[in-house]
Structure formats: structure tokens, C-alpha cells
Amino acid sequence: MAGEVEGEGCRVSWGVLVALLLLPLPSLCSLTAGKQLQVIKLFEGRVVRYNESKNFCYQRTYEPKWSDVWTKIQIRVNSTKMIRVTQVENEEKLKEMETFNMFDFFSSFLKEKLNDSFIYVDLYNNKTCIKVHVSDTDTYYSVALSRGFDPRLFFVFLCGLLLFFYGDTLSRSQIFYYSTGITVGMLASMLILVFMLSKLMPKKSPFVALLLGGWSVSIYVIQLVFKNLQAICTEYWQYLLGYLGIVGFVSFAFCYKYGPLENERSINILNWTLQLIGLLLMYISVQIRHIAVTMVVIAFCTKQIEYPVRWIYILYRKIKLKRGKPSPPRLLTEEEYRKQGDVETRKALEELRGYCSSPDFAAWKTVSRIQSPKRFADFVEGSSHLTPNEVSVHEHEYGFGGSFLEDELFGEDSDVEEEMEIEPVLYQDLR
């Protein structure tokens, strides 16, 4: 009974505590509801300056066109000291921020901006509002709205295009494997550490809640680092280099231990992942929704039509090779062979005479090396390159009825007779 009474007393005390905590909320809500919210309208090209907390809203005045594919609309808040800028969807959200909401309180940390802030506005948002909170009265800040071409969106589109069309090549590249592994290790080292600690902790443990909170804290810290990246690079560059060196080496060692992908299925999964990331980058980089979908569909169809086109081209080449086989060359007759030999010989001799008569020809050096300079001089002047004796010997050897022709003719007959004599001998041996 005592235990039950104590338990009931604890429940009563907790209920009273919660009631006391929630008691001021209705009065606070009634105060904020009665108070009219002041909102300052933002216009393109106009800069406003204040030194106190204000609410600002931008309302879309025109429909996006096809020329706004890579156009950005951004709100820049620049201040002399540290401020807090929170982005919301509309004026109703600004009113809700005046009341205390636990979820909005934590989500505002992920949306808040510090000091020099850039808030990007979606072209299709009818209204975008921000709240600038100033802690000191001597803090001055300016708010400006600008609109124009964003080269970063175009760069993201090109990256998505390359990832989609060259995903297969990148998934098999060792350079891409190691560079991606090192980059992921540098950017997500804290998340990886929390993930490794979660593997070591038991499932039913109070540390699970701590790890879940650690993920949120890690994301928040990464967001703060990217916001203050310029200040970190200028003031703490030694620590930044040390961090990049250590984490980069550990990431490289981890990638080197497991090595690049070798299994074909794993490579295909990586290829498909890169292609999906490429399509996603192409979609988010284009500001006009229907144009973004059209570009994604065109890229997908172009990638898939590559295989049918390749098959059609291979089939066309095979059909062309079968139909258009080159005809065998026609053999020359004896008379054509002699005529062609005479024509080509005369042509070559004329070219040789022309070269010997040119200034580039070293006449004295050539004369010192030949046995009959007079015969060479006669040849250059137009005489025949053969003597009558050489002509008669050539006709005797290679002319009609010469020894060379007789050997060719009668040599074939003798070979046939020898084969006919060998066949009976082989037949007798086999018997």
C-alpha cells in the first residue's frame, strides 16, 4: 500500500509540474494573437537597413518562364555583428514563432542563419518570409533581394549530366573510388564516428538516445562549419590542414584495405546509384519543374537508346559486309605484265635521270663510288642503262624459249611424275 501511495504521489507531482509548465502558454498565445504582426515587404533591387528585430516577406509577382532555367532568387542579410535569421514559409509561420513550440524550437536551429546569410527562394513559392533576431541594439544589418543567373546551378547540372552518362566508367575507375572515399571521409567523419559507436553499443541501452541526439548534433555542427567555412580557413587553417590530413589518410587507408569494387553486381549497383544521383542533380538544378522533368526524360531516353542504336549499327555492318564483299582482283596476262613492266621501268628511269640532273644530287660523291663514270654520264644524258651484251643475256635467260621458262615448265612436269612414282611405292608399303 505504501508503494502504491508513493507511486500515486509521484504521478500527482509530475502532473502538477506539467500543468504549471503549460499554464503560461494559453496566456502567451492570447497575447500574441492580440498583437498585430508587422511585416516588411521585400522588392527586387531594394536594400533596407535596420538595427532591431524585424519580419520580412517576399511575394512572387510573376510566373517562371523557360528563360529562368538556371535563375536564382536570393535574400541576403548582412550585419555588423552576429544575428539569427530564421526562414519560414508564410506569415502564419511567423505568428507561430511568437509562441513557444518545442518542435519549431529545435527545427529553427537547422534553419537559422548567422551573420552574412543567403536565403534561396524557390521560383514557385508564392511567399517566403524571414525573421531577423538582433540581440544587441547597436547591431545594424541590411536586407537585399536579388535575382539573376546562377552559375552554380549550371555547374550542378553539368555534374549530374556527367554522372548519368559516365556512371559506368566512373564505377570502374580506381581514381574515382579513392577520391570519393577520401571526400566522404572528410565531410562525414563525425557521422561515421557516431555510426561506429552505435555498432558497439547494445540495442537496449540509455546510450541509444544519446546517439540519436548525436546525429542531430553532428548535422548541426556540419551546418555551422559550412556557414563559417571562410572564417575557419583564415583563422584556424593549421587545425583545418591537420584535420584534413589525418582524416584523409584514415579514409585512404580504409579504402585501400577493402580495395576497389571487383564484383560485377557491385559495380552495377554503384553505376545505377551514380546514374540516379546524376538524374537527381539534373532535376534539382533546373528551376522550372516541367523543363527539369523534360530534361531528365530526354537524358534517360538518350542513354537507353544507345543500346538499340549500337545493335542496329552492328547489324548494318554485318549485312553490308555480306553484300559488299570485294571481288577478287583480275590477274594480268603475260602480255599485260610485260607492257606494265616496260612502262613502269621507263617511268622510274626518267625519275632517276631527273634526280641525277638536279642540284640536290651529289655528283662527285656518286662518281667516286661507281666503277664506270662514263657509262653513268651517258645514262644521265639519255642513253640506255643496259649494254647490248646485257640485253642478249637477259633475252637468253628470261625470253621466250629461254632456260628460265623451260625450267618452270618442265620442272612442274617432273614434280608430277615424281609424285606419281611415289604413290605406288607407298601403296605397296602399306600392303
UniProtKB/Swiss-Prot annotation:
Region (BAF-binding site (BBS)): 368-375
Region ranges (A): 176-287
Positions of the UniProt region annotated as Interaction with banf1-a and banf1-b: 326-431
Signal peptide interval: 1-29
Lineage top rank: taxon: Eukaryota
Keywords linked to the UniProt accession: Developmental protein, Erythrocyte maturation, Membrane, Nucleus, Signal, Transmembrane, Transmembrane helix
Any single GO BP term: erythrocyte enucleation
Gene Ontology cellular component annotations, sorted alphabetically: nuclear envelope; nuclear inner membrane
Post-translational modification: Phosphorylated.
Motif window: Nuclear localization signal: 317-325
UniProt KW Transmembrane keyword: yes
Coiled coil (residue ranges): none
UniProt-annotated stretches for the region B: 326-395
Location of the protein in the cell: Nucleus inner membrane; Nucleus envelope
Membrane topology (UniProt): Multi-pass membrane protein
Residue spans crossing the bilayer: 151-171, 175-195, 206-226, 236-256, 266-286
Family: Belongs to the NEMP family.
Domain-related comment: The transmembrane domains are required and sufficient for its oligomerization.
Assembly, per entry: Homooligomer. Interacts with banf1-a and banf1-b. Interacts with ran-gtp.
Role played: In concert with ran, required for proper eye development. May be involved in the expression of early eye marker genes. Contributes to nuclear envelope stiffness in germ cells. Required for fertility. Essential for normal erythropoiesis. Required for efficient nuclear envelope opening and enucleation during the late stages of erythroblast maturation.
Protein's name according to its UniProt entry: Nuclear envelope integral membrane protein 1
Gene for this chain: nemp1
